Amino acid sequence: MKKNYISIFSIFTFVALFLIGCNKQEKNILKPNVLFISIDDLRPSLGVYGDSIAITPNIDKLAMDGIIFTDSYCQSAVCAPSRASLMTGIRPDSTRVWHLGDKFRELKPDAVTMPQHFSKHDYHTVNIGKIFHNYMPDSVSWDEPDLRPARYLKKDWLKRDGETFYISEKVNTSQSIKRDSLLKIKPIRYADGWNTGPAWEAADVHDTMYYDGAQTKLAKATLTRLAKMNQPFYLGLGYFRPHLPFAVPKKYWDLYNPNQIPLAKNNKIPSGAPLYSMNSMYELRHYDGFSNIGHPTSSYRMSEDVIRKLRQGYYASVSYVDALLGDLFSHLIKIGIYDNTIIVIWGDHGWKLGDHNSWGKMTNYNIDLKVPVIIRYPNQENRGVKTDGMIELVDLFPSICELAGIDVPDYLQGTSFVPLTTNPELNWKHATFSQFHRRPKVSADGKRYMGYSINTKKYHLISWYGWDSETGTRGDFKSNELYDKEFDRFETQNLADRLDMRDVIIKLSNQLSEGWRKALPEYTAQNLIYTDSKK
């Protein structure tokens, strides 16, 4: 009898464990995968965003199977602050990441990033490429952090060495010499890979010979492996182009005739804008042949031939990444996981291509703040639609959580925009909020400032203050910039000094002071919680 009891008990236990395992497996299978794609320095220069020059058939095709957000803003127009805000779901004044060198994990050691949160909900999280800032892959966030193609794992290379950008042996020899020299002079600064060479390259090679192509090949192999797991995955895949240098295969350069690419329509700094509003172009200045370019506020003018070459390089880089994504999406279909995968494409900030007599990001102007966001998810009701509802990159964390059906942390400072995917015409946020820290070494007058930006549908207000970098607090008010987006979408004329704009500035200044919570869509759960807490 005792033996029978043990036998029956063993069978019961086995069946129970089997059923639990099946339930867990079934639960995981039902969860959608997440493919989270960052494209560095990508402004909305895509066909689906109305850019008639851009050749981006694959991104456009995905957009026709998803939703396009046409009025999206980053929280800060430079890599580290923008990405730290997006990935933690909190804003720059909360992360305290204000410029490139700030490392969010040192400033916020207990921060729970988006992939960490997904990992807590039984997702297997993997990182390939640039999701956080270059040399800050944040191994804490991933089950498999910072995977790289095998040929880029050389012991003597820096974390993001300049030699990973180029094909030319001559250039790479020069890069190696430069790297070793810089490490001797400033070992701490250059240990993370601050090593630049030519601003462009167009080698006649296969796509996989450049880094982005090699990591796409790795991503395909990784996806094949992940598809066989009985667990949903979150893959963060970050592309380096179209960030400088514009080093991509020649065939993508050949897609564009530089003489047929129109020049920037707003090639002057905004009239009436303060000098410290503009970036110094120090990013471009680091590349060969550009060390002597002037500040945008000076009389310096780049030659038209060079302007066209740079613009051609940017568009070629965008088309290169587009082709790689086409290959990646075809692979998702081939291995049978496309239908059950949330795909997100986002740019971390915009980029000036001669706009405002400048190159690069690092301003509070909308040419730098506006970004593309495209999302495709399983069982989506509306496909191929656009919404002009205002969203922010900080909204991605709660939105992807909701789409995946997992809990949304209540401390996040973004708002899930999932309701816009079911009703693109929904009356949404009243405003978006951004900021930029202007450091003395790159400001026109050698002083330090913080500019706070609020965008509404009609206006864009930028308020500048002095800034105490030690305490992280604003000082005295310095100036305002006001732009009428309806009549001046290229932001050419600062209206802040006009008497008839005083009431507008007062209203917008109050909105800016009240902050993001007061700009929430009506009747969202987040808004109701905030309102109730104020009673």
Summary of predicted features, one role per range:
Residues 525-526:
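Short, glycine/acidic-rich hinge or "gate" loops at secondary-structure transitions
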Residues 487:
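Extracellular, beta-strand-rich glycan-interacting domains
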Residues 482-483:
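Short hydrophobic beta-strand that contains or immediately precedes a catalytic carboxylate
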